[in-house]
C-alpha cells in the first residue's frame, strides 16, 4: 500500500513539475569553426535555436570577427562603423536573448561577400517538454 501511494505521489509530482529546459551551446560551424569556405546556411539547417541558447564563434583571433547586424546589413555585407559592436576574441559567445531572425557577419574585408555570414531564427520557449510519467498498473487514486 505504501508503495502504491509513493507511486501516485511521484506521478502527481512528475505531472505538475514544470519542464526544465537547458540552454544549448552551438559552436558555429562545428569543428570547422567560424571561417571562410563553410556554408553556414547548410550548417544551420535542421537546428532549432531557442531563447537562452548560445552561439559560440571559434576562430583565430585577428583573422576574423563577429558582428551582429540587421537584415539589410546582412544582405549587403555592411559592417557597422562602430567597432565596439563587434567581437574579436576568437572565442566569442553570444546569448540568444530574444526570439526572431538574427544575422551575423565577419567584419574582415571581403569575408562576408565570401560567404562568412550566418542567419538563424530563434524560437521563443525551450525544447519540447518530455512526456509525463504514467502511474503503474496497480496504483489507485
Regions found by a protein language model. Give the residues of each.
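Cross-kingdom Sec-pathway N-terminal secretion signals
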Residues: 32-34, 46, 57
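Short, Lys/Arg- and Gly-enriched loop/turn segments at beta-strand edges
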Residues: 62-71
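Cleavable N-terminal signal peptides of Sec/SRP-targeted secreted and luminal proteins
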Residues: 5-21
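Short, surface-exposed secondary-structure boundary micro-motifs
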Residues: 54, 59-60
